[in-house]
Amino acid sequence: MTNLIRSNFQDHPFHLVSPSPWPLNTSVCLLNLTTTGALSMHNFNNIHYLYYIALIGLVSAMFLWFRDIISEGTFLGDHTLAVQRGLNLGIILFIVSEALFFLAIFWAFFHSALTPTVELGAQWPPIGIEPVNPFELPLLNTVILLSSGATITYAHHALIKGEREGALYGSIATILLAIIFTGFQGVEYSVSSFTISDGAFGTCFFFSTGFHGIHVIIGTIFLAVALWRIFAYHLTDNHHVGFEGGILYWHFVDVVWLFLYISVYYWGS
Protein backbone atom coordinates (compact mmCIF):
# COMPACT_ATOMS: atom_id res chain seq x y z
CA MET A 1 0.00 0.00 0.00
CA THR A 2 1.40 3.35 -1.03
CA ASN A 3 1.71 5.97 1.68
CA LEU A 4 0.60 9.26 0.08
CA ILE A 5 1.05 12.59 1.84
CA ARG A 6 -1.56 15.18 0.87
CA SER A 7 0.87 18.09 1.34
CA ASN A 8 3.05 16.71 -1.47
CA PHE A 9 0.32 17.36 -4.04
CA GLN A 10 -1.36 20.51 -5.35
CA ASP A 11 -4.80 21.08 -6.83
CA HIS A 12 -3.66 23.61 -9.47
CA PRO A 13 -1.36 23.46 -12.53
CA PHE A 14 0.90 26.37 -11.57
CA HIS A 15 4.48 26.29 -10.33
CA LEU A 16 4.98 27.80 -6.89
CA VAL A 17 8.64 28.76 -7.10
CA SER A 18 10.81 27.96 -4.10
CA PRO A 19 12.88 30.77 -2.53
CA SER A 20 15.94 31.37 -4.70
CA PRO A 21 19.02 33.57 -4.18
CA TRP A 22 19.73 33.99 -7.90
CA PRO A 23 17.40 36.94 -8.74
CA LEU A 24 18.95 39.08 -5.98
CA ASN A 25 22.44 37.84 -6.81
CA THR A 26 21.98 38.66 -10.49
CA SER A 27 20.57 42.13 -9.69
CA VAL A 28 23.50 43.00 -7.42
CA CYS A 29 26.01 41.81 -10.02
CA LEU A 30 24.27 43.83 -12.75
CA LEU A 31 24.32 46.94 -10.53
CA ASN A 32 28.03 46.49 -9.84
CA LEU A 33 28.72 45.77 -13.52
CA THR A 34 27.03 48.95 -14.77
CA THR A 35 28.47 51.09 -11.96
CA THR A 36 32.06 49.91 -12.43
CA GLY A 37 31.66 50.14 -16.21
CA ALA A 38 30.62 53.79 -15.94
CA LEU A 39 33.41 54.56 -13.46
CA SER A 40 36.00 52.95 -15.73
CA MET A 41 35.07 55.45 -18.45
CA HIS A 42 36.09 58.23 -16.05
CA ASN A 43 39.54 56.70 -15.46
CA PHE A 44 39.06 55.54 -11.86
CA ASN A 45 42.18 53.66 -10.80
CA ASN A 46 41.96 49.84 -10.77
CA ILE A 47 38.17 49.92 -11.16
CA HIS A 48 38.42 47.35 -13.95
CA TYR A 49 39.25 44.67 -11.39
CA LEU A 50 35.86 45.21 -9.73
CA TYR A 51 34.27 45.15 -13.20
CA TYR A 52 35.71 41.71 -13.92
CA ILE A 53 34.65 40.44 -10.49
CA ALA A 54 31.07 41.62 -11.16
CA LEU A 55 31.16 40.01 -14.61
CA ILE A 56 32.32 36.67 -13.20
CA GLY A 57 29.63 36.88 -10.52
CA LEU A 58 26.95 37.60 -13.13
CA VAL A 59 27.98 34.67 -15.33
CA SER A 60 28.07 32.37 -12.28
CA ALA A 61 24.60 33.48 -11.13
CA MET A 62 23.21 32.97 -14.64
CA PHE A 63 24.70 29.47 -14.82
CA LEU A 64 23.26 28.45 -11.45
CA TRP A 65 19.88 30.03 -12.24
CA PHE A 66 19.72 28.20 -15.58
CA ARG A 67 20.62 24.97 -13.77
CA ASP A 68 17.70 25.33 -11.36
CA ILE A 69 15.20 26.20 -14.10
CA ILE A 70 16.31 23.25 -16.23
CA SER A 71 15.95 20.93 -13.24
CA GLU A 72 12.45 22.23 -12.48
CA GLY A 73 11.24 22.02 -16.07
CA THR A 74 12.95 18.85 -17.25
CA PHE A 75 13.35 16.57 -14.24
CA LEU A 76 10.77 17.75 -11.67
CA GLY A 77 7.89 18.29 -14.11
CA ASP A 78 7.03 21.75 -12.77
CA HIS A 79 6.55 23.27 -16.24
CA THR A 80 2.99 22.20 -16.97
CA LEU A 81 1.01 23.48 -19.97
CA ALA A 82 -0.28 26.39 -17.87
CA VAL A 83 3.25 27.27 -16.78
CA GLN A 84 4.47 27.06 -20.39
CA ARG A 85 1.76 29.50 -21.49
CA GLY A 86 2.82 31.87 -18.73
CA LEU A 87 6.47 31.63 -19.73
CA ASN A 88 5.60 32.33 -23.37
CA LEU A 89 3.58 35.38 -22.33
CA GLY A 90 6.47 36.59 -20.17
CA ILE A 91 8.90 36.27 -23.08
CA ILE A 92 6.56 38.21 -25.37
CA LEU A 93 6.12 41.00 -22.82
CA PHE A 94 9.89 41.14 -22.31
CA ILE A 95 10.41 41.54 -26.07
CA VAL A 96 7.75 44.28 -26.15
CA SER A 97 9.59 46.16 -23.39
CA GLU A 98 12.84 45.82 -25.35
CA ALA A 99 11.09 47.12 -28.48
CA LEU A 100 9.99 50.22 -26.55
CA PHE A 101 13.57 50.74 -25.40
CA PHE A 102 14.78 50.67 -28.99
CA LEU A 103 11.93 53.03 -29.90
CA ALA A 104 13.44 55.56 -27.51
CA ILE A 105 16.86 55.08 -29.14
CA PHE A 106 15.44 55.64 -32.63
CA TRP A 107 13.54 58.67 -31.33
CA ALA A 108 16.81 60.19 -30.10
CA PHE A 109 18.50 59.44 -33.43
CA PHE A 110 15.79 60.97 -35.62
CA HIS A 111 15.40 63.95 -33.28
CA SER A 112 19.09 64.75 -33.79
CA ALA A 113 19.16 63.86 -37.51
CA LEU A 114 16.01 65.71 -38.63
CA THR A 115 16.70 68.88 -36.65
CA PRO A 116 20.51 69.23 -36.42
CA THR A 117 21.60 72.11 -34.22
CA VAL A 118 24.01 74.92 -35.05
CA GLU A 119 26.69 73.16 -33.00
CA LEU A 120 26.47 70.26 -35.47
CA GLY A 121 26.83 72.61 -38.43
CA ALA A 122 23.07 72.47 -39.11
CA GLN A 123 23.57 69.32 -41.16
CA TRP A 124 23.55 65.55 -40.73
CA PRO A 125 26.03 63.89 -40.59
CA PRO A 126 27.82 66.77 -38.83
CA ILE A 127 30.79 68.50 -40.45
CA GLY A 128 33.99 66.52 -39.95
CA ILE A 129 32.25 63.17 -39.45
CA GLU A 130 32.90 60.45 -42.02
CA PRO A 131 30.05 57.93 -41.62
CA VAL A 132 30.42 54.19 -42.14
CA ASN A 133 29.82 53.06 -45.73
CA PRO A 134 26.52 51.10 -45.56
CA PHE A 135 27.44 48.94 -48.58
CA GLU A 136 30.59 47.45 -47.07
CA LEU A 137 30.78 45.69 -43.70
CA PRO A 138 27.24 46.67 -42.55
CA LEU A 139 25.71 45.08 -45.64
CA LEU A 140 27.70 41.89 -45.07
CA ASN A 141 26.58 41.85 -41.44
CA THR A 142 22.98 42.24 -42.59
CA VAL A 143 23.28 39.18 -44.82
CA ILE A 144 24.92 37.22 -41.99
CA LEU A 145 22.25 38.11 -39.42
CA LEU A 146 19.34 37.40 -41.77
CA SER A 147 20.96 34.08 -42.67
CA SER A 148 21.14 33.22 -38.98
CA GLY A 149 17.41 33.86 -38.74
CA ALA A 150 16.85 31.33 -41.53
CA THR A 151 19.08 28.69 -39.91
CA ILE A 152 17.41 28.98 -36.50
CA THR A 153 13.99 28.67 -38.16
CA TYR A 154 15.23 25.51 -39.87
CA ALA A 155 16.41 24.18 -36.49
CA HIS A 156 13.01 24.93 -34.95
CA HIS A 157 11.08 23.10 -37.66
CA ALA A 158 13.51 20.18 -37.47
CA LEU A 159 12.93 19.87 -33.72
CA ILE A 160 9.15 19.96 -34.18
CA LYS A 161 9.43 17.14 -36.72
CA GLY A 162 11.59 15.13 -34.34
CA GLU A 163 14.73 15.52 -36.46
CA ARG A 164 17.26 16.05 -33.68
CA GLU A 165 20.26 16.14 -36.01
CA GLY A 166 18.76 18.95 -38.09
CA ALA A 167 17.98 20.92 -34.94
CA LEU A 168 21.58 20.54 -33.78
CA TYR A 169 23.11 21.58 -37.10
CA GLY A 170 20.74 24.53 -37.50
CA SER A 171 21.48 25.79 -33.99
CA ILE A 172 25.25 25.38 -34.45
CA ALA A 173 25.12 27.31 -37.74
CA THR A 174 23.12 30.09 -36.08
CA ILE A 175 25.58 30.44 -33.20
CA LEU A 176 28.56 30.50 -35.57
CA LEU A 177 26.91 33.22 -37.68
CA ALA A 178 26.17 35.19 -34.51
CA ILE A 179 29.81 35.00 -33.42
CA ILE A 180 30.95 36.13 -36.89
CA PHE A 181 28.48 39.04 -36.78
CA THR A 182 29.76 40.13 -33.37
CA GLY A 183 33.37 39.89 -34.56
CA PHE A 184 32.67 42.01 -37.64
CA GLN A 185 30.88 44.55 -35.47
CA GLY A 186 34.01 44.80 -33.34
CA VAL A 187 36.13 45.28 -36.47
CA GLU A 188 33.79 48.05 -37.61
CA TYR A 189 34.19 49.83 -34.28
CA SER A 190 37.98 49.49 -34.33
CA VAL A 191 38.39 51.06 -37.79
CA SER A 192 35.73 53.75 -37.36
CA SER A 193 36.91 57.32 -37.92
CA PHE A 194 34.74 58.66 -35.08
CA THR A 195 34.01 57.66 -31.48
CA ILE A 196 31.08 57.76 -29.08
CA SER A 197 32.40 61.14 -27.85
CA ASP A 198 32.00 62.81 -31.27
CA GLY A 199 28.78 64.66 -30.61
CA ALA A 200 25.22 63.48 -31.13
CA PHE A 201 26.14 61.45 -34.23
CA GLY A 202 28.77 59.35 -32.46
CA THR A 203 26.60 58.90 -29.38
CA CYS A 204 23.51 57.81 -31.35
CA PHE A 205 25.52 55.53 -33.64
CA PHE A 206 27.50 53.67 -31.00
CA PHE A 207 24.68 53.54 -28.47
CA SER A 208 22.15 52.12 -30.94
CA THR A 209 24.46 49.62 -32.64
CA GLY A 210 26.25 48.76 -29.39
CA PHE A 211 23.02 48.11 -27.53
CA HIS A 212 21.92 45.89 -30.40
CA GLY A 213 25.28 44.11 -30.19
CA ILE A 214 24.66 43.40 -26.50
CA HIS A 215 21.33 41.86 -27.47
CA VAL A 216 23.09 39.70 -30.06
CA ILE A 217 25.46 38.42 -27.36
CA ILE A 218 22.55 37.72 -25.00
CA GLY A 219 20.67 35.93 -27.78
CA THR A 220 23.77 33.88 -28.58
CA ILE A 221 23.99 32.74 -24.96
CA PHE A 222 20.26 31.97 -25.03
CA LEU A 223 20.65 29.78 -28.13
CA ALA A 224 23.86 28.16 -26.85
CA VAL A 225 22.01 26.97 -23.74
CA ALA A 226 19.20 25.65 -25.96
CA LEU A 227 21.77 23.87 -28.15
CA TRP A 228 23.25 22.14 -25.13
CA ARG A 229 19.76 21.10 -24.01
CA ILE A 230 19.02 19.62 -27.44
CA PHE A 231 22.31 17.73 -27.28
CA ALA A 232 21.44 16.46 -23.76
CA TYR A 233 17.97 15.27 -24.87
CA HIS A 234 16.19 17.81 -22.63
CA LEU A 235 13.91 19.15 -25.38
CA THR A 236 11.15 17.31 -27.21
CA ASP A 237 9.00 18.11 -30.22
CA ASN A 238 6.23 19.53 -27.98
CA HIS A 239 8.14 20.76 -24.93
CA HIS A 240 10.82 23.35 -25.78
CA VAL A 241 9.71 26.66 -24.30
CA GLY A 242 13.26 27.93 -23.75
CA PHE A 243 14.21 27.20 -27.34
CA GLU A 244 11.11 28.96 -28.68
CA GLY A 245 11.84 31.94 -26.46
CA GLY A 246 15.38 32.14 -27.82
CA ILE A 247 14.05 31.96 -31.39
CA LEU A 248 11.53 34.76 -30.79
CA TYR A 249 14.26 36.87 -29.23
CA TRP A 250 16.58 36.19 -32.17
CA HIS A 251 13.96 37.21 -34.74
CA PHE A 252 13.43 40.39 -32.73
CA VAL A 253 17.18 41.08 -32.96
CA ASP A 254 16.96 40.53 -36.74
CA VAL A 255 14.11 43.02 -37.15
CA VAL A 256 15.84 45.66 -35.01
CA TRP A 257 18.99 45.32 -37.11
CA LEU A 258 17.01 45.90 -40.32
CA PHE A 259 15.67 49.16 -38.87
CA LEU A 260 19.19 50.10 -37.74
CA TYR A 261 20.68 49.38 -41.14
CA ILE A 262 18.03 51.34 -43.04
CA SER A 263 17.86 54.34 -40.70
CA VAL A 264 21.31 54.68 -39.07
CA TYR A 265 23.64 53.22 -41.70
CA TYR A 266 21.86 53.98 -45.00
CA TRP A 267 19.62 57.01 -44.43
CA GLY A 268 21.79 58.48 -41.65
CA SER A 269 24.91 58.52 -43.80
From Swiss-Prot:
One of its GO terms (molecular function) is ubiquinone binding. The chain crosses the membrane at residues 23-41, 49-73, 81-114, 138-161, 165-188, 202-230, 249-265. InterPro entries: Cyt_c/ubiquinol_Oxase_su3, Cyt_c_oxase_su3_dom, Cyt_c_oxidase-like_su3, Cyt_c_oxidase_su3-like_sf, Cyt_c_oxidase_su3_a-hlx. One of its GO terms (biological process) is mitochondrial electron transport, cytochrome c to oxygen. Residues 42-48, 115-137, 189-201, 266-269 are mitochondrial intermembrane. It comes from the Eukaryota. It is found in: Mitochondrion inner membrane. It catalyses: 4 Fe(II)-[cytochrome c] + O2 + 8 H(+)(in) = 4 Fe(III)-[cytochrome c] + 2 H2O + 4 H(+)(out). One of its GO terms (cellular component) is mitochondrion. Its EC number is 7.1.1.9. Keywords: Membrane, Mitochondrion, Mitochondrion inner membrane, Translocase, Transmembrane, Transmembrane helix. Its main location: mitochondrion. It is a multi-pass membrane protein. Residues 1-22, 74-80, 162-164, 231-248 are mitochondrial matrix. Signal peptide: none annotated. Component of the cytochrome c oxidase, the last enzyme in the mitochondrial electron transport chain which drives oxidative phosphorylation. The respiratory chain contains 3 multisubunit complexes succinate dehydrogenase (complex II, CII), ubiquinol-cytochrome c oxidoreductase (cytochrome b-c1 complex, complex III, CIII) and cytochrome c oxidase (complex IV, CIV), that cooperate to transfer electrons derived from NADH and succinate to molecular oxygen, creating an electrochemical gradient over the inner membrane that drives transmembrane transport and the ATP synthase. Component of the cytochrome c oxidase (complex IV, CIV), a multisubunit enzyme composed of 11 subunits. The complex is composed of a catalytic core of 3 subunits Cox1, Cox2 and Cox3, encoded in the mitochondrial DNA, and 8 supernumerary subunits Cox4, Cox5a/Cox5, Cox6, Cox7, Cox8, Cox7a/Cox9, Cox6b/Cox12 and Cox6a/Cox13, which are encoded in the nuclear genome. Belongs to the cytochrome c oxidase subunit 3 family. This is Cytochrome c oxidase subunit 3. It comes from Neurospora crassa (strain ATCC 24698 / 74-OR23-1A / CBS 708.71 / DSM 1257 / FGSC 987).
